[in-house]
Amino acid sequence: MNTSFIQALLVASRRFGIQCLIQVMFGLTAMGFASLALAETSRLEKVLQNKELRACIWPEYYSITYRNPKTRELSGIDIALTQELAKELGVKVRYVDSNFSQLYDALEQDRCDVATHAIGITAERLARLQFSQAYLKSGLFAVTLKNKDGLQSWDSLDQPGRVIAVAAGTLMEGIMAKSLKKAKLVKVQAPGTREQEVLSGRADAFMTDYPYSLRMIELTDWAAVIPAPNNMPTTEYAYAFAKGDNSLLLRVEAFLSNVKKDGRLLQYAKQHNLDPIVVLK
């Protein structure tokens, strides 16, 4: 307490009596303890108290957090892993639809406790978010029309007159903005899709990663996939959390270490054809 505050209390005690002073001090002490208790309720404690883990997902992310448009059922490695995590915590998972352009708002505005849709670790994101250890790692893939004239290799992408589409907010946006020298880069905002840009002819190709390229190969009959050369960057994927409290992050870290050791991560990666990009160490 500062000097002026103490002097004010002494004046109050002389004017209204010592009993009043005691009551005031008791009230201030109670308020202080209440504030302290509130401040010490960690993210993990809230999850446990509410019996609910709010996990942000991108329901278009094939083999990661994909919602089947016909059955509305969710599947993917991160659906399986979050169910395992929830089981260990003794809570249920509530999946919150999101996407990469909403990533910061979803976490910072407390719409979810953790983003669990294979978030690529980038310098920009590290400045605003906390990340778990990596569990996947992917390079880039270009998706174009089968037998499209002049588009058979990676080198044919960055040419004058070419249009390359990326989903806004994805790590591909930053990578391609730096690497493209001749082609035009188009950022696609939801509800628009990269596929629509290519199918309509507005773009020659769109950029994606290994998991999403599986969707194009397995669910379409028009897509050709071109992998990036070895000199292009790869990105590690992890779970993301808002800055500040790290209690849930530490618990997820322990969980990821365990599923790497006991084989569950590799098991789920194989189930969803992601074993070529799984990170086990």
Language model region names:
Residues 40-118, 127, 271:
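Extracytoplasmic small-molecule ligand-binding "clamshell" domains
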Residues 41, 171-186, 224-228, 257-281:
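Ligand-binding clefts/hinges and TM-proximal coupling segments of bilobed small-molecule sensing domains
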Residues 59, 136-144, 210, 214-257, ...:
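Periplasmic-binding protein-like
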Residues 65-71, 82-91, 154-158, 172-189, ...:
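Ligand-binding cleft/hinge of the Venus flytrap
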Residues 79, 95-105, 152, 186-196, ...:
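Short helix-initiation/N-cap motifs at beta->coil->alpha
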Residues 102-105, 119-127, 175-178, 199-233:
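A ligand-binding cleft/hinge motif common to bilobed small-molecule-binding domains
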Residues 145-162:
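Flexible hinge/capping segments at coil-to-helix
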